[in-house]
């Protein structure tokens, strides 16, 4: 190493108080990999590998020598290099508490507040909260908001997490002290009224153990008392990469002179992503965080100087402090900066990322570069010239960025720091950012304006406007800026500015990133927001008249802020005489919640590595449709540690053909590939990194085939459908109904797909056993299918294959059939090599390979009367299946059976087409076609209401099904309480009051509008295929009275095991604590159905009851003889009397199996789950941003087995549906390549996206006679209520359009992204844009 100081190559750090010393650390290894693979601390999870989900969050503690304090930081272990941990203390979820010792209050409160479902995200959320409390023992709700910006949860809907952790905050305490309703656990809704039939207390806060800071683990004294590790220069080398950590500026600059192409790594938030996903190799990495000059902070009268390696959170903290202390006029750049930093990534990223890295990376969508460029920020750079340190000053502004991710700073130079100038009274700096999601998202477009006025006037003296997202670099608009100089800033000038910007900042129709019209509109819209914001300041200062900005327009400058959550959960109280040990109807904590909160819960990839285990890496297709002309794995096999390559050549044609129903798929592509991401082959190697590196060396040559079909419209054009389609369902006399109709209308609607984004990706471990047996541990919702197809691929009988699934980190249907993509190659490799083999897909692989929810297109013609009564509907349903059938036929059928939603239509013809395209095969997803079908139905009901001029609510009521009505598939509705749900929800939500409030708001605001929407739902409960409606159970009672229960369902996070324990506890009359469920395994319960279709509790619960009844029957004589004995005594007596204490249970759902020809009188569904949701939404008409202000839900779920779990399912389903209809957009190239392969581009709802007021009520007094203990299914039915946000948004857009003279209907596809919202709000700014003619260009992305 250059420089005079001797470097060390020994890595030393602490993990959970234990010292770790490594003499040969790998610079390419992340902290997450080190924790999991070397230290076997598997509580920390891999969710995305790009710092976007927070599942890998740990706390890093280090001694700040300058401040003489210990800093505790939540960080993403998936991005943090382990080499950067030298001299640090790492705390993981295992290090703060356990079920075997003592739970930490952070773990306890999350679990007992029902904030953990699948549990895969739970350790990361726990550690984000823990790190917050280590820095602020009593945080504010805003602190919580910030702490969780970098964490995602796909299951809970976030509400219970916030409710549990709210108990730590300042806002939670009130003047009532111990009598406060929030402390004593009684809630504020009168749940303690003994006369009430409802309860509102899901957990008792008063029983939480207090937070005691004195009990926290101490910072290692060795690190606190000595700076030896901080003063050491480091050099760590591997075969490919060398890591340097200099401690002086001289060393750093000498290193940069010796290695000009070396990457400086501070937070590794950009380089880590490049290395992981772009497979960049940087042979030299330099970590400059201990170079004093790069950590310097100094202040002067004119500015604050931050060293280039100072973290964004430290910059944010100091700037906020100065904003509080200094006059407002001096801190406008500071305020602008902290405003932008709030939306810069998540807290875990901001804790380690630095401003210098942001500048030097030069991303065209950087959040900070437009601010710094507009401000003309002064930078200090240094280099070694003739052995001496040479410094110079560089200004950000015109000419600083010289190209994509390039600037004027030379390769051998190092950025030392940035000056933040204080502003003057006549200077204003504002910035705005628009992204797909507000929190933790990259910008679509951002803009910053730095303007100085002539003294005490609104005449522009000088102005700089910078934009991100409009070119390969941050760009200025000098021509438009010059136009504004010496002009008063007013509406007239803004008209000219808007026109000028449209010309100065063009964007090619095929530009990367897509959304061309939207991005161009944002440029003008964001500048208009800046104008409104600055004019407001000028007005406040008395420089311009108070009415210079019309009152209706002032709110256009405002941004959405996350409100403090308000919520209520109401459910039916259990009878006062119900035995204490009877758990049915009680809000029991999820059976695995405490293990999940402590990191003790074991998921598939947490299973300890076995001796001789190999890892499987996949070779994936890089073509959408092509013939494979060459497949050469020789380069991969030449690598040391690579043991085998598998392809279709290793299987017979028959063995290679697989599929859940139709065997039209292949384990490995044979001859042709049909989509991007199809598995072509697999490499077995010693470890994951090597397997993946080797897989990239496999050479595949192709011959392109055509046509490539990606979209539904292309499939229709080419007639590309699966055989036997279209299919039709008919009812009544269509011709007569349309001939007699007073009105007819033809319309269409369309919605995109949705990525499952279970936090745990697909994973499998296969272990060969003796006697030609194979044991699989698999993240699957359908163990029996995996067993069957593994047996098929290996030509083994099924009894030699055992598939086990202990728990899944989420599934949502995505692990029902697609798990075979991973399990089959893993099983084959293990069987052939006779060694254990493992694979867990990376997030980008999982998203590319495993398919999504089906996109749908609907075309309909409807007949109706003048009062809105629908008399007939002719509808065509098209789904995009991808390249193989999978379950698409059944998804289509459910859409066809659900399109009418809650509305009775006497005459129906519904046709369905399964479109075959060159996309990965789409598959089951929560709702299974039902939400798509009901989406069409809600469009129809609103079209009818609009045409006849009646309120939608009135038309809904007019058309509602009533008890006794018959559906278009001949099922009579026996109990249909939709009107009761509606009435309760209208009252709960103050619907009519809110409508009046919305009307008033919309009259008073031009650029912000609100809408409200009511959504009813009717979801049929049963598998569409009759034979799947069955389940089995096995009950084993041991001599000590403990019970081991097995059933055919899989615990995915939905609380199935918890409910089964509750069912067995009531049936046996024993406490839940005596019952344990270990796993789901095909050698315990054979021939299981998938855990899907929301029937898991129904069919498995009845099987459990059957087993319990058999056991009870055997025990009955003993109980009669010993009526005063205990359960343990009865069991002991039974054992000695040689009574079998093992029982099997079985259940087959009765009365179903409808077929229009062979079984027309049977039911299609066992029953229906109904509900109603009402959402109020506000939109920003200038940006397309939106916020859900409130959501109220009333669900009829019969007699709830567990209200806490059921309400959690309702909230989680709503948020998933909300994501489907508003946020989650899959981006494909015109050739079918998926762009959105991780949380960086694919946005599911975050903590800040939940409704500001979120109320859920369970309908009381509505037992269901057709399911276990009078309950109803709850997993899928609430999802469609998320569409209430979509239709509320559409109502708000309509109000915006009316403001500009636009009436009538307008198209709005789902999801209603910010781009679609903004472009639907047509106005004077969007009218400035020229729209290129369709077909004159190739778009960057298309909608499948």
UniProtKB/Swiss-Prot annotation:
It catalyses: xanthine + NAD(+) + H2O = urate + NADH + H(+); hypoxanthine + NAD(+) + H2O = xanthine + NADH + H(+). It holds the Pfam family FAD_binding_5. InterPro entries: 2Fe-2S-bd, 2Fe-2S-bd_dom_sf, 2Fe-2S_ferredoxin-like_sf, 2Fe-2S_ferredoxin-type, 2Fe2S_fd_BS, Ald_Oxase/Xan_DH_a/b, Ald_Oxase/Xan_DH_a/b_sf, Ald_Oxase/xanthine_DH-like. The active site is at residue 1276. Keywords: 2Fe-2S, FAD, Flavoprotein, Iron, Iron-sulfur, Metal-binding, Molybdenum, NAD, Oxidoreductase, Peroxisome. Residues 236-425 form the FAD-binding PCMH-type domain. Mo-molybdopterin binds at residues 781, 812, 926, 1093. FAD binds at residues 264-271, 344, 354-358, 367, 415, 433. Substrate binds at residues 816, 894, 928. One of its GO terms (cellular component) is peroxisome. SMART domains: Ald_Xan_dh_C, CO_deh_flav_C. One of its GO terms (biological process) is xanthine catabolic process. Homodimer. Belongs to the xanthine dehydrogenase family. This is Xanthine dehydrogenase. The gene is Xdh.
């Amino acid at each position: 190493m250059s420089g005079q100081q001797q470097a060390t190559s020994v890595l030393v750090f602490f993990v959970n108080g234990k010292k770790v010393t490594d003499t040969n650390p790998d610079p390419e290894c992340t902290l997450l990999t080190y924790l999991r693979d070397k230290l076997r601390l598997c509580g920390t999870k891999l969710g995305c590998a790009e710092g976007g989900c927070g599942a890998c969050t740990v706390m890093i503690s280090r001694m700040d020598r300058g401040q003489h304090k210990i800093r505790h930081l939540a960080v993403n272990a998936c991005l943090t290099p382990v080499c950067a941990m030298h001299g640090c203390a790492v705390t993981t979820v295992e290090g703060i508490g356990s079920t075997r010792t003592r739970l930490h209050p952070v773990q306890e409160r999350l679990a007992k507040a029902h904030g953990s479902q699948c549990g895969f995200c739970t350790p990361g959320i726990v550690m984000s909260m823990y790190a917050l409390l280590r820095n602020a023992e009593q945080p504010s709700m805003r602190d919580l908001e910030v702490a969780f910006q970098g964490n995602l949860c796909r299951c809970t809907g976030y509400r219970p997490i916030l409710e549990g952790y709210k108990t730590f905050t300042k806002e939670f305490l009130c003047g009532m002290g111990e009598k406060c309703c929030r402390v004593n656990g009684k809630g504020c809704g009168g749940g303690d009224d003994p006369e009430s039939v409802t309860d509102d207390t899901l957990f008792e806060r008063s029983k939480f153990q207090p937070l005691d800071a004195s009990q926290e683990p101490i910072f290692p004294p060795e690190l606190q008392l000595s700076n030896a590790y901080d003063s050491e220069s480091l050099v760590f080398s591997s075969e490919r990469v060398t890591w340097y950590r200099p401690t002086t500026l001289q060393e750093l600059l000498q290193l940069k002179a010796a290695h000009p192409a070396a990457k400086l790594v501070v937070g590794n938030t950009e380089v880590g992503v490049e290395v992981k996903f772009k497979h960049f190799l940087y042979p030299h990495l330099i970590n400059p965080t201990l170079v004093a000059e790069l950590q310097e902070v100094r202040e002067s009268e004119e500015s604050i100087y931050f060293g280039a390696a100072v973290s964004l959170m430290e910059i944010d903290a100091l700037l906020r402090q100065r904003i509080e202390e200094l006059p407002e006029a001096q801190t406008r750049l500071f305020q602008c900066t902290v405003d932008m930093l709030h939306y810069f990534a998540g807290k875990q990223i901001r804790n380690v990322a630095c401003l210098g890295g942001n500048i030097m990376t030069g991303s065209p969508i950087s959040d900070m570069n437009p601010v710094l460029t507009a401000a003309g920020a002064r930078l200090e750079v240094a280099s070694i010239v003739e052995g001496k340190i040479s410094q110079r000053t560089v200004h950000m502004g015109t000419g600083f960025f010289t190209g994509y991710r390039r600037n004027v700073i030379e390769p051998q130079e190092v950025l030392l720091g940035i000056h933040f100038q204080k502003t003057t009274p006549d200077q204003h700096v504002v910035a705005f950012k628009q992204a797909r999601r507000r929190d933790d998202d990259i910008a679509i477009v951002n803009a910053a304006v730095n303007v100085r006025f002539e003294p005490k006037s609104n005449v522009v003296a000088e102005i700089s406007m910078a934009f991100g997202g409009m070119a390969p670099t941050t760009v200025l608009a000098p021509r438009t800026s010059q136009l504004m100089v010496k002009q008063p800033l007013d509406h007239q000038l803004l008209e000219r500015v808007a026109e000028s910007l449209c010309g100065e900042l063009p964007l090619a129709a095929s530009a990367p990133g897509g959304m061309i019209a939207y991005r161009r509109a944002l440029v003008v819209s964001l500048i208009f927001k800046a104008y409104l914001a600055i004019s407001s300041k000028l007005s406040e200062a008395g420089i311009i008249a108070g009415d210079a900005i019309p009152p209706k327009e002032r709110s256009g400058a405002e941004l959405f802020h996350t409100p403090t959550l308000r919520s209520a959960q109401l459910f039916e109280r259990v009878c006062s005489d119900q035995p204490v040990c009877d758990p049915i109807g009680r809000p029991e904590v999820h059976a695995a919640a405490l293990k999940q909160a402590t990191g003790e819960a074991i998921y598939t990839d947490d299973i300890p590595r076995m001796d001789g285990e190999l890892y499987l890496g996949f070779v994936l297709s890089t073509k959408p449709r092509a013939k494979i002309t060459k497949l050469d794995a020789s380069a991969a096999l030449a690598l040391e540690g690579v043991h085998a390559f598998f392809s279709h050549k290793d299987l017979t044609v028959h063995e290679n053909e697989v599929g859940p129903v139709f065997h039209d798929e292949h384990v490995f592509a044979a001859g042709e590939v049909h989509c991007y991401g199809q598995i072509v082959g697999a490499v077995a190697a010693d470890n994951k990194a090597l397997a993946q590196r080797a897989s990239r060396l496999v050479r595949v040559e192709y011959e392109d085939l055509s046509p490539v079909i990606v979209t539904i419209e292309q499939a229709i054009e080419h007639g590309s459908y699966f055989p036997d389609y279209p299919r039709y369902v008919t009812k009544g006399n269509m011709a007569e109904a349309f001939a007699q109709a007073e009105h007819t209308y033809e319309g269409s609607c369309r919605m995109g797909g949705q990525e499952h984004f279970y936090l745990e990706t697909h994973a499998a471990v296969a272990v060969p056993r003796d006697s030609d047996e194979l044991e699989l541990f698999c993240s699957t919702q359908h163990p029996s299918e995996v067993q069957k197809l593994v047996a098929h691929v290996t030509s083994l009988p099924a009894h030699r294959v055992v598939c086990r699934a202990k728990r899944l980190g989420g599934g949502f249907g995505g692990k029902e059939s697609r798990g075979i993509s991973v399990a089959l190659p893993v099983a084959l490799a293990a069987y052939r090599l006779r060694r254990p083999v493992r694979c867990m897909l990376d997030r980008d692989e999982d998203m590319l390979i495993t398919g999504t929810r089906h996109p749908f297109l609907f075309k309909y013609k409807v007949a109706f009367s003048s009062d809105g009564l629908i008399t007939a509907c002719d509808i065509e349903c098209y789904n995009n299946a991808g390249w193989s059938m999978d379950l698409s036929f059944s998804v289509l059928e459910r859409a066809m059976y659900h399109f009418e939603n809650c509305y009775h239509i006497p005459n129906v013809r519904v046709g369905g087409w399964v479109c075959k395209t060159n996309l990965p095969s789409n598959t089951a997803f929560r709702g299974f076609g039902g939400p798509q079908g009901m989406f069409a139905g809600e469009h129809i009901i609103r079209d009818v209401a609009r045409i006849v001029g009646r309120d939608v609510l009135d038309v809904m009521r007019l058309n509602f099904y009533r008890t006794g009505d018959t559906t278009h598939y001949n099922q009579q509705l026996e109990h249909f309480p939709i009107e009761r749900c509606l009435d309760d929800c209208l009252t709960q939500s103050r619907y009519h009051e809110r409508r009046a409030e919305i009307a008033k708001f919309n009259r008073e605001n031009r650029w912000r509008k609100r809408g409200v929407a009511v959504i009813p739902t009717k979801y049929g409960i049963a598998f569409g295929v009759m034979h799947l409606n069955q389940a089995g159970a096995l009950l084993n009672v041991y001599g000590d009275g403990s019970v081991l229960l097995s059933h055919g369902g899989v615990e995915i996070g939905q609380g199935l095991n918890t409910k089964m324990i509750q069912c067995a506890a009531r049936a046996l009359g024993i406490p839940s604590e005596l019952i344990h469920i270990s796993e789901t395994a095909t050698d315990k319960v054979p021939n299981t159905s998938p855990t899907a279709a929301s029937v898991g509790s129904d069919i498995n619960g009845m099987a459990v009851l059957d087993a319990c009844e058999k056991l009870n029957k055997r025990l009955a004589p003993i109980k009669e003889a010993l009526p005063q004995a205990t359960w343990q005594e009865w069991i002991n007596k039974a054992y000695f009397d040689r009574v079998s204490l093992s029982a099997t249970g079985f259940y087959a759902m009765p009365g179903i199996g409808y077929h229009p020809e062979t079984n027309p009188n049977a039911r299609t569904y066992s029953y229906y789950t109904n509900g109603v949701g009402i959402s109020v939404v506000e939109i920003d008409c200038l940006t397309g941003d939106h916020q859900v202000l409130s959501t109220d839900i009333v669900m009829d779920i019969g007699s709830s087995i567990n209200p806490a779990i059921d309400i959690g399912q309702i909230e989680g389903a709503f948020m998933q549906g909300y994501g489907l209809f508003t946020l989650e957009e899959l981006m494909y190239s015109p050739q079918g390549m998926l762009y959105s392969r991780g949380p960086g581009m694919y946005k599911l709802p975050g903590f800040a996206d939940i409704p500001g007021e979120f109320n859920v009520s369970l309908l009381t007094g509505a037992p269901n006679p057709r399911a276990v203990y009078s309950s109803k299914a709850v997993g899928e039915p609430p999802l469609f209520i998320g569409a209430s946000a979509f239709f509320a948004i559409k109502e708000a857009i309509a109000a915006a359009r009316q403001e500009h003279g636009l009436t009538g209907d307008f198209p709005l596809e789902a999801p209603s992204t910010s781009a679609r919202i903004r472009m639907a709000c047509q106005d004077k700014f969007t009218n400035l844009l020229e729209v290129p003619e369709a077909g004159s260009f190739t778009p960057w992305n298309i909608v499948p």
